C-alpha cells in the first residue's frame, strides 16, 4: 500500500536489497531538509509526543546495535529509534537512530540541540516518565519549550508537593466523573540551574511549575492485589525451595 501513495525510484514493491540501498542513500542533509519541511506543516497549537522504541536485532555489523534496557525482554541487543509525532496531525516531525545502550533520559539533550539547529519554534512536548531528570527539565526551561512530562511519585520533589494535599486528595470535590478518577493541580517552584562556561558561573533561579496529581482507585486496588499475589508466590518459592 505504501508504494501506491508515495513516490520512489521503483515501480511497485521495493525488494529487500533495493530498500537497503535506498535507506543508505539518505544523508543527514536529506533528513534535516525533511524535518524542516515537516516543521512548516505542523499545526500551530498541537503538542508533540516524544518517545523512543527499541528494535531488537541479531546483526553484528550495525554499530548502533548494543545491549541495553530491552523493552521486549527478548534477551537481544537493540537499536533505539527516537520519534516526535504531532498529536492532531499524526505526522512524524523528527526521528533519530540511537545506540541501544542509551537511556531515554539521556536523549532529550540531543533532541533540543536538533530542534535548535532546525529552527523550529514554539514546540510543546509531551513525554513519559522515562525522560524525567533534573538535567532535562533545566534544558527545557533553558530553551523556553513548553512541556508536560510524567514523573514517579517516589521522587522527592513530587512527593514533597503531594504531602500537603494528601489527606484531602480523595475528597468529593477532586473527583472527575468524566475520567473516573481523583485529580488535583498544585502550583510549585522549580529550582532552575544553568551553568555558563563562557562566564565561568552558575545561574540559579526559581521557575513556576504546575504538578498534576491523579489517583485511580480501581487501578490502586488492582496494583495492591498484584503485589499481594507476588508476595504469595515468593513465599511459596521460599517454602518449597523451588521457583514457581
Task: Please state what every model-predicted region is.
Residues 1-244:
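Anion-binding and metal-coordination hotspots
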